[in-house]
Regions:
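A short beta-strand submotif of the Rossmann-like class I SAM-dependent methyltransferase core
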Residues: 1-2
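Short "lid" loop at the C-terminus of a central beta-strand within the Rossmann-like core
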Residues: 5-7, 39-43
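Glycine/threonine-rich flexible loop motifs
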Residues: 6-16
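A short glycine-rich, Lys/Arg-flanked "PGG" loop and its adjoining helix->strand segment in the class I
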Residues: 16-30
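Conserved Class I S-adenosyl-L-methionine
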Residues: 21, 44-66
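Conserved beta-strand signature within the Rossmann-like core of class I S-adenosyl-L-methionine
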Residues: 31-38
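Soluble small-group transferase modules, centered on the S-adenosyl donor enzyme superfamily
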Residues: 42, 63-204
């Protein structure tokens, strides 16, 4: 799991480069998964597309999950991720997994599957033509702080959401969304509300 601070912080942009992702890929064990955080708020669309393009240049099997309105998790493996989605349901009965997920409001597999936002083809389309970030061209380190007050979160949310149509979702995700009850959607809403709640670490 790579959840650095925002890329406008000095030195953090190096954790969004091709070299960083290549290093992560080299260390993945068979069946291992990388989860890379990104965000849609206070960032230009150009920079967000570059982050996605850089990630998919190393992990072409990458997928995207929206954990709330502003946070994106890009999840990838050495093997295609979409065929692994069924593991979410089959492994849910593990006490440790279910307990940990319940702490963040995910009570059943639908809660997690409903967060799926984009598959490899959609991510590739979103990042098409964007600059691939590398250690020799650390553009993000300079563009990110410059765009903090210029970027439109609403525009980024809309453009990112537009890359996936319902019919393009994996069959498992699509079928679970089609069959979801009102109670399940309310449970999802509760989970999303919980994801927006936070406390200062040193207050605990």
């Amino acid at each position: 799991i790579s959840e650095p601070s925002n890329p406008w912080i000095a030195g953090v942009a190096s954790l969004f480069t091709r070299e960083f992702f290549e290093g992560a890929r080299a260390r993945l064990a068979p069946g291992g998964i990388i989860c890379q955080w990104a965000h849609t708020y206070t960032i230009s669309e150009r920079d967000l597309r570059s982050i996605v393009a850089t990630f998919t240049s190393v992990f072409p099997n990458g997928t995207a999950w929206m954990v709330n309105d502003n946070d994106v998790l890009m999840v990838a493996s050495l093997d295609p991720v979409v065929p692994m989605l069924g593991n979410i349901e089959s492994h849910w009965s593990r006490a440790t997994a279910a307990g940990n997920l319940a702490e963040v409001g995910a009570i059943e597999p639908f809660d997690v599957l409903s967060l799926f936002a984009a598959g490899p083809a959609e991510l590739a389309r979103y990042g098409a033509g964007a600059d691939v970030l590398d250690d020799d061209r650390m553009r993000l380190e300079f563009s990110a702080p410059r765009e903090i007050h210029n970027a439109s979160t609403g525009d980024n949310d809309a453009s990112f959401a537009a890359i996936t149509q319902f019919d393009a979702l994996p069959e498992l995700v699509r079928s679970r969304r089609e069959r979801a009850t009102a109670a399940q959607w309310r449970g999802r809403a509760d989970m999303m509300a919980k994801s927006d709640a936070y406390s200062i670490a040193y207050d605990d």
